[in-house]
A protein has these predicted regions:
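Class I (Rossmann-like) S-adenosyl-L-methionine-dependent methyltransferase catalytic domain
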Residues: 1-24, 29-78, 101, 115-193
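Short catalytic micro-motifs in class I SAM-dependent methyltransferases
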Residues: 89-93
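Short, conserved catalytic or interaction motifs in soluble domains
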Residues: 96
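A conserved beta-strand element that flanks and buttresses the S-adenosyl-L-methionine
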Residues: 86
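A short glycine-rich, Lys/Arg-flanked "PGG" loop and its adjoining helix->strand segment in the class I
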Residues: 100-112
Length: 193
């Protein structure tokens, strides 16, 4: 896998929103983004459901608190305690109802004005399963034995309609995985109290 510098342009924003506190990273994988966050001086609480990914992340970013847990389990942060949550390509494995519930739980751990920065599979991500697979529900397909959701801008707007203010929504392409991966990059703040 190639290095993906996507977080670099966001670091000043993340540092400001974190306000000296920890960043929670959902689905940290092997810890590449974890290491980037640490290098920017941000304390990190990260988790992934795959034990081998957690082991790799702990080796790459030993200063971070990294746990093995499922995104559907309770988060390792108290309600209203965080200024930033990062979720790069980790929110797309679930039904629409589960996805909404996860996003609501992310909102609950953020303080008012806190930032969620996420990347989501885009509906035109042809190399990684957006078309030609059995549908489970609209925008959710069974790809190689695993459910994968592919978002369009309308779905993102609906997902973050209640209790969020979208600051940035843009299509992007990552070259981390060998072939171009189409995705949506979303930054939104927790609105209200």
């Amino acid at each position: 896998m190639a290095h993906d510098p996507w977080l670099d342009r966001w670091l000043p924003v993340l540092v400001r929103h974190a306000g000296g506190g920890a960043v929670m990273e959902i689905g940290c994988g092997g810890g590449e983004d974890t290491a980037t966050l640490l290098a920017a001086g941000l304390p990190v609480i990260a988790f992934d459901r795959a034990p081998e990914a957690v082991a790799a992340a702990r080796e790459r970013a030993p200063q971070a608190r990294i746990e093995c847990r499922d995104i559907r389990d309770p988060f390792p942060a108290e309600p209203g305690s965080l200024g930033v949550v990062v979720a790069s390509l980790s929110l797309h494995y679930f039904s629409w109802v589960e996805t909404q519930a996860i996003v609501q739980r992310v909102r609950e751990v953020l303080r008012p004005g806190g930032l969620l920065l996420c990347r989501l599979n885009a509906d035109d991500d042809l190399h990684f399963g957006a078309h030609g697979h059995p549908p489970i529900e609209p925008h959710l397909f069974m790809v190689d034995g695993h459910p994968k959701r592919f978002f369009d801008e309308d779905q993102v707007q609906r997902l973050f309609a209640a209790g969020w203010q979208i600051q940035s929504l843009r299509r992007d392409v990552s070259h981390k995985y060998g072939q171009p991966k189409s995705l949506l990059e979303v930054a939104c703040e927790r609105a209200g109290s």
